[in-house]
Swiss-Prot record:
GO terms for molecular function: O-acetyl-ADP-ribose deacetylase activity. Belongs to the MacroD-type family. Residues 1-175 form the Macro domain. CDD domains: Macro_OAADPr_deacetylase (cd02908). It comes from the Bacteria. This is Macro domain-containing protein XAC3343. It holds the Pfam family Macro. SUPFAM superfamilies: Macro domain-like (SSF52949). NCBIfam families: PRK00431.1-2, PRK00431.1-6.
Amino acid sequence: MRIEVWQGDITELDVDVIVNAANESLLGGGGVDGAIHRAAGPRLLEACEALPQVRPGVRCPTGEIRITDGFDLKARHIFHTVGPVWRDGRHNEPEQLANCYWQSLKLAEQMMLHSIAFPAISCGIYGYPLHQAARIAVTETRDWQRSHKVPKHIVLVAYNEATYKAYQQALATQETAAA
């Protein structure tokens, strides 16, 4: 079992599932959400449009997950999750972000998926501070692997050097604390 930090395009990974940092409409957007929609092809948008709305314009509330096929991606599945918009850290943002990771891992386990790739959820337009988000991502994935067998391979995908360094620093800090 391992956690890997990888810098590059999440849509290129050959894993069982990639996690999409989506918006509540699931209709595509900017950042990683737009990249995943473009790479997966038009059938992804059709699949997202077919998902029921829980209230007008909302198919996936913050912290929840919806599943689609991977379509034109190497990944077989896409887990769409909506991370919190950063306000000031006092409106349950850390708990909501942690829940995005935990619920994705729980669903991967239920589906017996062995590999999962996460983007830096909420770190783009949603404005979550990168180092805090990286610490949450590492904590949640490490805690999961301590008590679960699946998924065996977790990839934290960095879209740039700053994100890569933040993940590496969070991993190193946890390794030092665990020693």
